[in-house]
Amino acid sequence: MQPVVETLSGLERRVDLAVSVAEVEKEVQAQLKRVGRTAKVAGFRPGKAPLAMLERSHGPGIRYDVINSLVGRAFEQAVDGAKLRVAGSPTLTPKTEGVADDTLAFTATFEVYPEVTVPDLSALAVTRYDTPVTDAEVNQTLDVLRKQRAKFETREGRASQDGDRVVLDFAGTIDGVPFEGGKAEDFPFVLGQGRMLPEFEEAALGLKAGESKVFPLKFPDDYQGKEVAGKTAEFTVTVKEVAEGVLPEVDAEFAKSLGQAEGDVEKLKADIRTNIEREVKARLQGRTKGSVMDALVEAGKFDVPKALVDSDVEGRIAAAREELKQRGVPNADSVPMPAEVFSTESERRVRLGLLVSELVKQAQLQAKPEQVRARIEEFAQNYEQPAQVVSYYLADRQRRAEIEAIVLEDNVVAHVLENAKVADEKVPFDQLMGMA
């Protein structure tokens, strides 16, 4: 008789399972005999140990495995018969009351996948972002490259300006007490690069060699040095050297220094434009995809299996700990990481994954081989040997699967943009690139 699956609440289900003791013992004896053919028992030749002795040494482990296997098979038959898709693993609880001596009974509690309804795409409001790349962006990038290759020349009597390198001594106190990291001598940095806190750079601006200044500085609340975060220090700086940054001319020598073998400045600019356009395209795609996915998640109203959310949380915690280890953080495995910190985002990820999967199935948006190859070739342009990168990705199943997942998401985004209410929005170049 087919077991009856009960609905508890939401996606949670329950079913009672039973296996006969006789079936368990029959399988246990069969496995003991198989083990006995090769088992090495002291005092006996291989295969000659008494079954009773094998029962004592191997019986408990074999019996445990057999019961798990038979109960698992009964569970699969029950959910298959009810045509259910199980999310995660069931929780099994032994039953004793009202159970015959010749039967082992269990209650399996589990979750099922929800019925996912793709929202009406025509009702979704999404944003498609765009950033034009002009000569101004190319020239701006050229300026950045020139500043990175600046040569600094000491200028006597020069008041420091943005772009100058200053060498100074500094000492800071909090409530009159020195603190760790608050003092240095012959400390160099370039004004305007954002390496130092804004108040510190502002204090050093306009000073000449030999001049000093005393000023207050409030550390941000989220400052990396937790012992001083949110506190106000008093700093004294003394400038010892001011060096002006002399930028290289944009000429053949400069072009060659950036890998343009011919020293052709116009070809260098064309290469820079190509690289900028590639980076801009990737960032715009990311922003637009974010808008599309946010709209899908917001419109997708259905329960998600807690088992899948918990699994995602565990994966993200493991990844976070691994990242801490890579950064050299001591005792990374014992750093507190409460599950609730990750649960909201994990629920969103699970919901989005179910929605995308259903949308791909309904609209037949699977990644095509030619799309995957085109995306790999595009990605390979970031490397010096693109052809080798393409061959590597095509030959490696795992790497290829990663690109297939990206292409699949691209197809989903394109499909939503074709059907949703789309608002086009220009993003300033500096903002897109995180320079503003």
Curated annotation (Swiss-Prot):
It comes from the Bacteria. Pfam families: FKBP_C, Trigger_C, Trigger_N. Residues 163-248 form the PPIase FKBP-type domain. GO terms for molecular function: peptidyl-prolyl cis-trans isomerase activity; protein folding chaperone; ribosome binding. It is found in: Cytoplasm. It catalyses: [protein]-peptidylproline (omega=180) = [protein]-peptidylproline (omega=0). The keyword Ligase does not apply. The keyword Cell division applies. One of its GO terms (biological process) is 'de novo' cotranslational protein folding. Its main location: cytoplasm. It is an enzyme of class 5 (isomerase). Transmembrane segments: none annotated. Consists of 3 domains; the N-terminus binds the ribosome, the middle domain has PPIase activity, while the C-terminus has intrinsic chaperone activity on its own. Involved in protein export. Acts as a chaperone by maintaining the newly synthesized protein in an open conformation. Functions as a peptidyl-prolyl cis-trans isomerase. This is Trigger factor. It comes from Bordetella parapertussis (strain 12822 / ATCC BAA-587 / NCTC 13253). The gene is tig.
